[in-house]
From Swiss-Prot:
Gene3D superfamilies: 1.10.287.70, Cytochrome c oxidase, subunit III, four-helix bundle. It is found in: Mitochondrion inner membrane. Component of the cytochrome c oxidase, the last enzyme in the mitochondrial electron transport chain which drives oxidative phosphorylation. The respiratory chain contains 3 multisubunit complexes succinate dehydrogenase (complex II, CII), ubiquinol-cytochrome c oxidoreductase (cytochrome b-c1 complex, complex III, CIII) and cytochrome c oxidase (complex IV, CIV), that cooperate to transfer electrons derived from NADH and succinate to molecular oxygen, creating an electrochemical gradient over the inner membrane that drives transmembrane transport and the ATP synthase. It comes from Homo sapiens. Coiled coil: none annotated. This is Cytochrome c oxidase subunit 3.
Length: 261
């Protein structure tokens, strides 16, 4: 690294791709073992290996960017393109769920009673918990923007405050969604309605948990003075991801909760 004459980061040999691949093998094998032989040992080992790999890999990325200065402008540009492509792939991922929902709801089969929601399904009231969830996520979108602008203006205290509010709102959303699932009058086994509802909203809930974790890491890094007004792509990527989660929820609310009910 000391003698290179270009601005690109030539990553040194790392064990983490190997341990990551091993953890993926252990998790998938462990899942099969759990389903068929009711043993969670292999699955737990896979999850532990995966968690340790993620922690150590991202720790190395933080060291390379914050302390070693390897994330030069060309490298950051590549990271931005990578994040944009990742979010684009997530858009298509959710498009599949919306396709399944609209395919089933716009032309319901005779087996569903010829109408939507299917016979026997009592949908959730879109003006109760789902509307509260919508307002919570919209508020978190405002607070993450506040945090971003505070960071760009070198206002450290306001950035920390706004980021903490965003994380708490994300946690509140997750708790509301969990309570809604427990009180739901239908289950994932109740035909195509239950399947599309729980898979689409469940995967969105998973993305909220991932986004909240992403923001929590950014919060800890901000407390450790890792971000500056000019060098904070880790936080910017988390903000992009959070806005994506926001927009997906709006489509879910309008499609499944409001129109679909």
């Amino acid at each position: 690294m000391t003698h290179q004459s270009h601005a690109y980061h030539m990553v040194k040999p790392s064990p983490w791709p190997l341990t990551g691949a091993l953890s993926a093998l252990l998790m998938t094998s462990g899942l099969a073992m759990w389903f068929h032989f009711h043993s969670m040992t292999l699955l737990m080992l896979g999850l532990l290996t995966n968690t340790l790999t993620m922690y150590q890999w991202w720790r190395d990325v933080t060291r390379e960017s914050t302390y070693q200065g390897h994330h030069t402008p060309p490298v950051q540009k590549g990271l931005r393109y990578g994040m944009i492509l990742f979010i684009t792939s997530e858009v298509f991922f959710f498009a599949g769920f919306f396709w399944a929902f609209y395919h089933s709801s716009l032309a319901p089969t005779p087996q569903l009673g010829g109408h939507w929601p299917p016979t026997g399904i009592t949908p959730l009231n879109p003006l109760e918990v789902p509307l509260l969830n919508t307002s919570v996520l919209l508020a978190s979108g405002v607070s993450i923007t506040w945090a971003h602008h505070s960071l760009m203006e070198n206002n450290r205290n306001q950035m920390i405050q706004a980021l903490l509010i965003t994380i708490l709102l994300g946690l509140y959303f997750t708790l509301l969604q969990a309570s809604e699932y427990f009180e739901s009058p239908f289950t994932i086994s109740d035909g195509i309605y239950g399947s599309t509802f729980f898979v689409a909203t469940g995967f969105h809930g998973l993305h909220v948990i991932i986004g909240s974790t992403f923001l929590t890491i950014c919060f800890i890094r901000q407390l450790m003075f890792h971000f500056t007004s000019k060098h904070h792509f880790g936080f910017e990527a988390a903000a992009w991801y959070w806005h994506f989660v926001d927009v997906v929820w709006l489509f879910l609310y309008v499609s499944i909760y409001w129109w679909g009910s």
